[in-house]
Design a protein with these regions (language model features):
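Alpha-helical structural context
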Residues: 286-287, 388, 412, 416
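C-terminal segment of classical bacterial N-terminal signal peptides
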Residues: 22-29
Length: 607
């Protein structure tokens, strides 16, 4: 479904801004050129005329509209004193507009908008926006009310499928940009690649600003089930090199890139794709003609990063606001009118903190009913727990709460394969310690408790693996631990995340027994690997229950992405856990806990 241009252009006209918008497949970029040529056709005024533009940016909102923790059922708080949510950042945005003059500001986002909280899950799956006479997505409501100008697509926009994304797009009063999200057959943009807007400069030609939106190539892996054969996601660098010159030729005085891509120049998916995952700094270095880049995806806080372009020697300014609307990036751009055209004289970036202001009552009132509906949903009781289960030490000790995930996955896969040629094969399962703070308290168990355990909307896949492949899989997973010599002090805060690997890329594997010797170098850590009490047979076949992220190559674990797929489903693993607990009625570790692995040093247990 293309962008609703009538609604978008009507909004632009109401603010007095002329807009050239390219990118819907039906409208080639060349058609937008006449709209931009008006700048060149105006009579130049006095050289030295100046104009100040402020571009505001958020990123990785992940469905956070209020400063509320749905998993804790209360106001969000952390040790750093952060505050979250669009209602909070809306107040910051209003402050900036009053300071700078709304007519001199632009508001952007760098993606990952419609996934990440029970709120976004609810309006994708429980009361879906795609239903006949379905609701308006709360993120669309909030961002429309705040007045976003353009938003880049994030990879999590595709988590619920293209139909949900297109419906969200239809509900937005702003374009969803993705120059490198192209139709598989035609290789033409499937979403608007860019957005252009003119700003009135008294006594001089208008200032034309172009925003190029770029999403993440990893979507081809992470949401393969939804996009394969429909959409392709080429590299950010090559697409920026294609589009930035076009935008300049169309009269853009300022070019901003909104990129759902970090700055590290690395990829979590290894060499599975020829495109870099975190390529924002690469774009700045390699592609001439960019003034600033709003960075997303990495969930890092970068007030200002200056990168020198290799070809022009000019400095490009990058900024990444902290996720969940905890920060607002500001790019202050100074222009001077010289020889009949606007030139960027300077760009600086800074951050504003959402914890310095109160919620915007306009947004609170707008979304209070939808928020209340979700709070009611997540507090439904589904069972009783005999003891408290927690992930506090699940990174370095085999924790029953993670065993619960694996037990559910094993049971679902066994039932799915019953009566097939694979029914007799042993089933093993992988699960990761997603959260360090998840807790299922003794007593009543709610959907909220289980959602805090499994925070992602992953689904279940069954893969055919050999013993040798599982051994390699475990060795790769064990690289998560920092090598620690026997006798050295063990600091659990420094024991994990070696090489920057996140917790979600460390896997337990149930059904096998093994030691991880952290005194050994990476690649030689798995010891005493057994199955049913005997040494693992490298040739034996297993069914491995994995989440779809891992099955598609997420985390670059060996063999699993290329392994034969035996079965898959669209029901979320979180839902399967809730169903399992509901059916049991009682959550008792004796029904799922098993000691499968432990950390050792030269054979001696660490704990």
């Amino acid at each position: 479904m293309p962008l609703n241009r009538r609604k978008f252009l009507s909004k632009s006209a109401a603010t007095g801004a002329g807009v050239a918008l390219a990118g819907a497949v039906a409208a080639p970029a060349a058609q937008a050129a006449p709209a931009a040529s008006a700048t060149a056709g105006q009579k130049p005024e006095n050289p030295g005329k100046r104009y100040s533009l402020t571009v505001m940016g958020t990123t990785d909102l992940h469905g956070h509209v209020f400063n509320w923790d749905y998993f804790k059922d209360g106001e969000y708080s952390d040790a750093a004193g952060n505050a979250q949510g669009l209602a909070r950042v809306s107040t910051l945005i209003d402050q900036v507009r009053k300071e700078k003059g709304r007519e001199n500001t632009l508001l952007l986002d760098a993606g990952d908008t419609i996934q990440g909280t029970p709120l976004t899950y609810y309006y994708a799956k429980v009361d879906p926006i795609t239903a006949k006479r379905g609701p308006v997505h709360p993120m669309a409501k909030a961002m429309n009310a705040i007045g976003y100008d353009a938003v880049a697509l994030g990879n999590h926009e595709f988590n619920y499928g293209i139909e949900t994304l297109r419906k969200f797009e239809e509900q937005c009063d702003f374009p969803l940009l993705g120059a490198n999200a192209v139709d598989h057959k035609t290789q033409k943009p499937a979403f608007p690649p860019y957005f252009m807007k003119k700003f009135h400069a008294p006594g001089a030609a208008p200032v034309t600003v172009a925003v190029l939106g770029l999403t993440n190539p990893g979507i081809a892996i992470w949401d393969k089930a939804y996009v394969q054969g429909k959409l392709d996601f080429p590299g950010l660098e090559e697409q920026a090199a294609k589009w930035v010159p076009k935008l300049r030729s169309m009269g853009a005085d300022v070019v901003i890139v909104s990129a759902h891509s970090g700055t590290s120049g690395t990829s979590s998916y290894g060499d599975q794709l020829p495109y870099v995952e975190d390529a924002a700094a690469n774009i700045a270095r390699q592609v001439p003609g960019i003034d600033a880049i709003l960075v997303g995806h990495a969930h890092k806080e970068i007030a200002e990063l200056k990168v020198v372009n290799d070809k022009t020697g000019k400095t490009v300014v990058l900024s990444e606001p902290l996720c969940y609307a905890e920060r607002l990036s500001l790019f202050d751009i100074e222009l001077v009118f010289v020889k009949g055209q606007w030139e960027v004289e300077s760009v600086s970036a800074s951050l504003r903190n959402a914890n310095t202001v109160a919620d915007d009552p306009k947004i609170t009132k707008l979304l209070s009913d939808q928020h209340a509906e979700v709070v009611k949903y997540v507090n439904q009781v589904v069972g009783q727990a005999t003891v408290t289960l927690t992930t506090v030490d699940a990174r370095y000790k085999d924790a029953p709460i993670i065993d619960l995930i694996n037990k559910v996955q094993e049971d679902v896969v066994k039932a799915a394969l019953a009566g097939t040629q694979y029914a007799a094969l042993p089933v093993v399962s992988q699960a990761s310690p997603f959260s360090r703070t998840s807790e299922i308290p003794a007593g009543k168990v709610t959907i909220r408790d289980l959602s805090s355990l499994y925070v992602y909307d992953n689904t279940l896949v069954a893969k055919l693996m050999t013993g040798a492949q599982l051994r390699a899989y475990l060795e790769y997973s064990a690289e998560y631990f920092v090598q620690t010599a026997a006798g050295a002090t063990v600091d659990v805060n420094k024991l994990t995340n070696a090489g920057g690997r996140p917790d979600y890329n460390y896997d337990y594997v149930s059904g096998l027994q093994y030691d991880i010797d952290i005194a050994q170098p990476a690649g030689s850590r798995i010891k005493n690997l057994t199955f049913n009490g005997a040494a693992l047979d490298d040739a034996q076949e297993f069914v491995m229950a994995v989440n779809n992220y891992r099955a598609n190559g997420g985390g670059a674990f060996p063999h699993v992405a290329s392994a034969k797929e035996l079965w898959a489903e669209s029901t979320e693993i979180r839902t399967r856990i809730a169903e399992w607990v509901t059916a049991k009625g009682v959550l008792d570790p004796k029904d799922f806990a098993s000691l499968d692995w432990k950390l050792t040093r030269n054979g001696t247990p660490v704990f």
